[in-house]
Regions:
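Catalytic-pocket segment enriched in acidic/His residues
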Residues: 51, 78, 154-286
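Residue-level recognition of short, solvent-exposed, well-ordered loop/turn junctions
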Residues: 63, 117-119, 226, 250-251
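N-terminal non-catalytic cap/leader segment that marks the start of a structured domain
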Residues: 1-90, 256, 273-277, 282-286
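Short, structured patches in soluble enzyme cores that scaffold and shape functional sites
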Residues: 7, 95, 111, 120-122, ...
Length: 286
C-alpha cells in the first residue's frame, strides 16, 4: 500500500491511499494524523472522495513529524569516500519539521551558504509507539518508507563538530512522494540521485551499516518513538563535497531522488527571497 498527503485548493490537506493514478481519501488530514489515529490497516479499505493524482500538489508525506532523527555515515561506500572507519554505533542528529518540503516543492537556497550538497536517503516512518524495542517490536513499528534528500549546507555543517547547523535549514529537505509499505519495495531496490539529469548516486538501499530495524531499536532506547516520527537512514557515496573538485547545487538546478518501489522527488533549487521572508516576519509582528 502507498499513502500520500495532498494539498487541496482550499488550503487544507488530506491523506489518500494511492490506487494507480487516483488518491482515495482515508478520512484523515495527513498521513501523520492517519498513523497517530492507528488508521494504517483501515486505510487499505478506505472509500472516501477520489482525486486525480496527475499533477496533484503533494505535501511532505508526513508534514509535521514529532521527531525527525537523521543518521550520518551509514552507507559503507560513503564512509569510505569520506575517509572514515566503519562505526560501532550510529551517528545521530535532528531536523525540525520546518525543514521539510514536498516531493515537487522548491528547495530554498539561502544566501548565507554557497556549498549546498545532495544526500539521497531512505526514510523510515514509524507507525506505532515504541520504547526500548526488541528486533521484532522494531520491525512491527515501521509503518513504511519514503524518499528523502538531506540537502546539506556543508560550509555551515563543518563550522563545528556538531553537524546540526548545516542540516536543519528551513525548506531544504524534500520527503515523499508517498509512504510505501515494505511489500511495495523490491529486495534489490536502488536509490538514485541526479542533478540536472546527471546520475551522481546509485546504491542498493540494503548497503546500510545499520538497517531500519537496527535504527528503531537503537533510537528507541534513548527516547520513545511515536507514530509519524521519521528516521532518515543516511546517504550513500557520491556526494558533491567528496568529489575532486567538489561540486554543489546552484539555483536553477533540478535535484531528482528516486527509490525503486517508492517513487521520485523532483525539486528545483531556487534562491531564497530574504526580503520576502523579512516582510512576512514584519507583517506577523504588526
Amino acid at each position: 500500500m502507498k499513502l500520500a498527503t495532498l494539498r487541496l485548493s482550499e488550503g487544507r490537506t488530506v491523506a489518500v491511499r494511492v490506487d494507480g493514478e487516483t488518491g482515495v481519501e482515508t478520512g484523515h488530514t495527513d498521513v501523520g494524523a492517519l498513523l497517530r489515529a492507528g488508521g494504517l490497516e483501515a486505510a487499505a479499505a478506505a472509500d472516501g472522495a477520489r482525486h486525480d493524482l496527475a499533477g496533484a500538489d503533494l505535501a511532505p508525506v508526513v508534514p509535521a513529524p514529532g521527531k525527525i532523527v537523521c543518521v550520518g555515515l551509514n552507507y559503507r561506500n560513503h564512509i569510505l569516500e569520506m575517509g572514515r572507519e566503519l562505526p560501532e554505533y550510529p551517528t545521530l542528529f535532528t531536523k525540525f519539521p520546518e525543514a521539510l518540503i514536498g516531493p515537487r516543492d522548491e528547495i530554498q537556497i539561502p544566501p548565507e551558504s554557497d556549498k549546498i550538497d545532495w544526500e539521497g536517503e531512505l526514510a523510515v516512518v514509524v507507525g506505532t509507539t515504541v520504547r526500548r524495542a526488541s528486533a521484532a517490536e522494531a520491525e512491527a513499528a515501521i509503518a513504511g518508507y519514503a524518499v528523502l534528500n538531506d540537502v546539506t549546507m556543508r560550509d555551515w555543517q563543518y563550522r563545528s563538530p556538531q553537524w546540526f547547523q548545516g542540516k536543519a535549514w528551513e525548506n531544504s529537505t524534500p520527503i515523499g512522494p508517498v509512504l510505501a509499505t515494505a511489500d511495495e519495495i523490491p529486495g534489490d531496490a536502488q536509490m538514485v540521485t541526479r542533478l540536472d539529469g546527471e546520475e551522481l548516486q546509485r546504491t542498493p538501499i540494503d548497503d546500510l551499516v545499520f538497517n531500519a530495524v537496527d535504527l528503531v531499536r537503537y533510537i528507541s532506547t534513548i527516547f520513545t518513538l511515536n507514530p509519524g516520527d521519521v528516521i532518515a537512514t543516511g546517504t550513500p557515496g557520491g556526494v558533491g563535497h567528496a568529489r575532486k573538485p567538489a561540486r554543489y547545487i546552484s539555483a536553477g538546478q533540478t535535484l531528482t531522488t528516486t527509490i525503486d518501489g517508492i517513487g521520485e522527488l523532483v525539486n528545483v533549487a531556487v534562491a531564497e527571497r530574504v526580503d520576502a521572508v523579512a516582510a512576512a516576519g514584519e507583517a506577523a509582528r504588526a
